[in-house]
From Swiss-Prot:
This is tRNA modification GTPase MnmE. The gene is mnmE. Residues 231-400 form the TrmE-type G domain. (6S)-5-formyl-5,6,7,8-tetrahydrofolate binds at R25, E82, K135, K478. It comes from Polaromonas naphthalenivorans (strain CJ2). One of its GO terms (cellular component) is cytosol.
Length: 478
């Protein structure tokens, strides 16, 4: 631990602004003297006590509840004091200042500060203390932040499961199996003179295959959890006036974007967070793609391409009404040719893993013959809502969402990356094990690297810069 981890800390634990209740939290080793100074009495452990909070001159700041959690039975593993007052910003700032003042006051008996080095906590420092004191592991700490930031009910429930340790338990089960396999390899290396084939006797190949199968299951659930956490960026693209804004409004269930018959109405992006089956989607409506008629439209089209290139999925809208060649064949031919050019441009600009869904809009205006000619994609009417459910289902399929919500771990990209690295190391280990003459030293190294990657998920193996990055993302007071 660093020296700062031994300093007592205090912070306002509730969100900024006005509220019915606000909390000031203090954590440190042996904080009983400052508890006495702040509360004017000794508090019974883990019992809420209603009392006045007074300043250094005895004047009442507020009245509320004080709860003392002696170590190690607290959130941080240290002594913790929580002061629950009315949630006004001024009241909470006064209580925070009073805590710092009480800690800095000199003890008449010793002439030393009552609570030396008491300071305001850094973002995430209470949760960091919980991790350092083995109250939670790193995956659980991250799940706490993910629960706070969850944008859908499904994401919140998945984060709660990870916070309770389901993800960590799955990782630890993998670690136990991996360590046992490593022991067999190391025993074979350490005792080559023994007339015992430890690997064959213990069915090392079978153990490795079972480990790989378990890993694949955990990785699949974690990948779905990463989708829940990060969300999916969906960009609506196409020529002007094909119904992009109408589609955004239909998906969002609200009139977010202006809809007019005039081509080029949308000049800048319009974004909205929606959810499909609990999966958060960041849907972006963009300017129509064509040769710009003025400088403002040109900027809007450039921004549209920027959004498209960073999308996880692109909904490319076709206007079925303009495909009808019965009234104006030349207009329809030109429109279809422009659509084809835009589709080619999309294919060239976008990464291969970006999903492109052809969406045929205005199906309510197309005749049966034209509808029969549509090959691939999804038929919809943004105006009537026809086909929207099929579009939602297609969106989830193309981005890889397939797990039942109750089976999903809330996971981060670093977790998924670590699990994939383990998968690669185990595949290399499998090749070594199946060789005619296995290179046991290389096999042992593959398994060691796999263990390091797994351990990084829960923090059993970590780097200080990784910890700093993770906990800095928390709010102050958590």
């Amino acid at each position: 631990m660093l020296a700062r981890h031994h300093h007592p800390i205090v912070a306002i634990a509730t969100a900024p602004g006005r509220g019915g209740v606000g909390i000031v939290r203090l954590s440190g080793q042996r904080i009983a003297p400052v508890v006495q100074a702040l509360c004017g009495r000794k508090l019974s452990p883990r019992q809420a006590t209603y009392l006045p909070f007074r300043d250094a001159h005895g004047q009442i700041i507020d009245k509320g509840l004080a709860i003392f959690f002696p170590a190690p039975h607290s959130y941080t593993g240290e002594d913790v004091l929580e002061l629950q007052a009315h949630g006004g910003p001024v009241v909470l700032q006064l209580l925070l200042a009073r805590c710092l003042e009480a800690g800095a006051a000199l003890d008449p008996a010793t002439g030393q500060p009552v609570l030396a080095q008491l300071r305001v906590a850094e973002p995430g420092e209470f949760t960091e203390r919980a991790f350092l004191n083995d109250k939670i592991d790193l995956a659980q700490a991250e799940a706490i932040a993910d629960l706070i930031d969850a944008s859908t009910e499904t994401a919140a429930r998945s984060a709660a499961r990870s916070m309770s340790g389901e993800f960590s338990q799955a990782v630890n089960t993998l670690l136990e199996q991996l360590i046992h396999l490593r022991m067999l390899v190391e025993a074979t290396l350490d005792f080559p003179e023994e007339d015992i084939d430890f690997l064959q006797q213990a069915d090392a190949q079978g153990q490795l295959l079972r480990l790989q199968a378990t890993l694949a299951s955990v990785l699949a659930r974690a990948t779905q959890g990463a989708i829940l956490r990060e969300g999916i960026k969906v960009v609506i693209a196409g020529q002007p006036n094909v119904g992009k804004s109408s589609l955004l409004n239909a998906l969002a269930g609200a009139e977010l974007a202006i809809v007019t018959p005039v081509a080029g109405t949308t000049r800048d992006k319009v974004s909205q967070l929606i959810q499909i089956e609990g999966v958060p989607l960041h849907v972006v409506d963009t300017a129509g793609l064509r040769e710009a008629l003025d400088e403002v439209e040109k900027i809007g089209i450039q921004r549209a391409w920027t959004e498209i290139e960073s999308a996880d999925a692109v909904l490319f809208l076709h206007d079925l009404a303009r495909h009808d060649a019965t009234e104006n064949p030349l207009y329809a031919i030109n429109y279809i040719a422009d659509d084809a050019r835009l589709q080619s441009a999309l294919a060239l600009k976008l990464p291969k893993n970006t999903a492109i869904i052809d969406v045929w809009n205005k199906s309510d205006m197309a005749g049966p013959e034209l509808l029969r000619q549509v090959n691939g994609g999804v038929l919809i009417s943004a105006k009537t809502g026809a086909g929207l459910q099929a579009l939602r289902e297609q969106l989830l399929r193309v981005v890889g969402w397939q797990a039942a919500p109750e089976g999903v771990f809330m996971a981060r990209e670093r977790h998924v990356s670590a699990l994939r690295s383990v998968q690669i190391q185990l595949l290399t280990a499998q090749n070594q094990l199946q060789a005619a003459v296995p290179a046991l030293d290389l096999l042992a190294e593959d398994l060691r690297q796999a263990q390091l990657h797994l351990s990084s998920i829960t923090g059993a193996f970590n780097a200080d810069d990784l910890l700093g990055e993770i906990f800095s993302k928390f709010c102050i007071g958590k």
